[in-house]
Each structure stands twice: as structure tokens, then as C-alpha cells.
Amino acid sequence: MGKIFKVGLVGCGHIAETYFRAHKYFNNFKIIKCADINKFAAQRCAKTYKISSVSVNELLKDKEIQVVLNLTIPNAHYLIAKKSLLNGKHVYSEKPLAVSFKDGKELIKIAKRKKLFIGNAPDTFLGGGNQKARELLDKKVIGKVKFGTGIFAYPGIQSYHPNPEPWFAKKGGGPVIDMGPYYLTALVNLLGPAKAVSYTHLTLPTNREV
């Protein structure tokens, strides 16, 4: 058996359950500790999945932890990732990497300087459908592609998330940061980097029941 990485999970909210359930199918890493600014959330995860709960700072400085799984709210991604890297740990974050391009570039520079890996959701472009599309493009089955689009509609994060408030923040909130990465990642993977960016928007109702 190859190396098993010891992982510390930060952010014991809604998405953490998905990672805890999925990680049992992999034999190259193990979540051994968890942390959250809400200590009760961390204790609940620790009890459910039979691991240790510690404070966020303790986890980030823990020499046993090799990889930090960053599942905090978007506005906290940059700070947790930066502290993790500076403490010599590889990082995998939920999307987005950061809420500004400047902060994202800084994280990449730190990772390169420290010779660490930093990864980020979504990894959905590695799924069967996207990879088949990539194969067809590589084989030029459909000729040269000139245009691609992604369409998404749903009633809002408040329709399923138990704590949707952070996703309505003026900075670090909204559908572009929440759902946009899935479509942008797929399009960039299939068509290459964007040369220009523009947008249109629709003014939505000012009030929404949460």
C-alpha cells in the first residue's frame, strides 16, 4: 500500500458530511481531526465519525496533519489556505480558491515557494461526461469548436442548505461564486482559457424568504 496522507478538516458544516461519507472509498488519505469556529459543530462531527476535534489554530499547527481540507465559507477560504500553507501543509479547498483574483494568485505563489500542493473544487470536470467530451474534442470528432455555453437554474441555496446566509454576502456570496465554478471549470477544460469576459444580469426580487 502507498502513502496514506493524514488530513485535517476545517469547516464542519453541510458539505463536510459529503467528504466524510466519500473518503472511506479512498485508501490514500484519512481524515483524522476536524475543527470549526463553532466548537459544537466540530464535536458533533468528531463524535459521528470517531475522530478528534480541536480548535482551528491547533489543527493548522498540528505536525501530524499533512493536508488541510478547507471546507469553510468562501470568505474564509483564503485565510485558512494561507495559514495552512505557511504551516507547511498541502491544501484542498472547496470552491472558490479565494473571493478575489489577487488573493488566489498569492496562494499559488506561496504554494510554489513552499513546494506544496494546493488544489481546489470543483473536480467534476474529471467525471465521465466531461472527460468523454474532452476525448471527442481531442480526436476532432466534431471539428473545431467555436462556442460553448453552460445553463443552470434552481430556486436558490436556501432551498436545501441549513445555513445559507453566508452565500448571500455582498463579498463572497452569490451564484457566480457558488455554482459558477462548475460551468467555468468545464468550459475552460474543454475550450481553453478565456480571452475576454463579459456579462449580463437580471434584477431579481429584492426580498427572498430564507
Regions found by a protein language model. Name each.
Residues 42, 80, 107, 133, ...:
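Aromatic/hydrophobic pocket-lining residues that form π-stacking "cages" and hydrophobic walls in ligand
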Residues 33, 66-67, 147:
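Short, Asp-centered acidic motifs that coordinate Mg2+ and/or phosphate
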Residues 201-210:
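Single conserved hydrophobic/aromatic residue that forms the stacking wall/gate
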Residues 19, 51-110:
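Beta-loop-alpha module in the N-terminal Rossmann-like domain of NAD(P)-dependent dehydrogenases
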Residues 1-49:
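N-terminal Rossmann-like dinucleotide-binding module
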Residues 124-202:
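Predominantly a Rossmann-like dinucleotide-binding segment in NAD(P)-dependent oxidoreductases
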Residues 106-123, 144-147:
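Rossmann-fold dehydrogenase core element
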